[in-house]
Amino acid sequence: LILGFSMLINLKNVQINDFFDKNIFLYMEDIDLCRRLDKNSQTILINKLFRVNHIGAKSTNLNNEIFDKIRNWHWMWSQYYFFKKYNGNFLAFIRFFPKLILTIIKFYILCISKNKNKIRYKFRAKGLFSSMIGKKSYLRPENL
């Protein structure tokens, strides 16, 4: 697994128009890119000697609450979209419907216990549901 924050790409071998899937935002674009490069017989090298210290969310000036909402929404939206893209909508639905139900249950349990993490599960459920019904990745800071 190669994470996007540590990729070096030879742009001579990649068509810039096809670089990233325009539908994906924030998560899974790096994995999708590697999968497409591999499918097109491009070489992907991994050097296990390299180490990258990735400090998440440091490139944004969003407050933690807004970023947490966006992060959780897009994490679930992108997982479903990616799985659907490579396996079809039926298999994606079969795999992710239980996750949707569990996420909703966790949300309600956390609401009852007045746990502040309930917002995380609310946005996970909303992101997953949006992807399942075919909505584009739309949640951005200005929408909150």
Regions found by a protein language model. Give the residues of each.
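Active-site-adjacent helix/loop segment of glycosyltransferases
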Residues: 35, 39-120
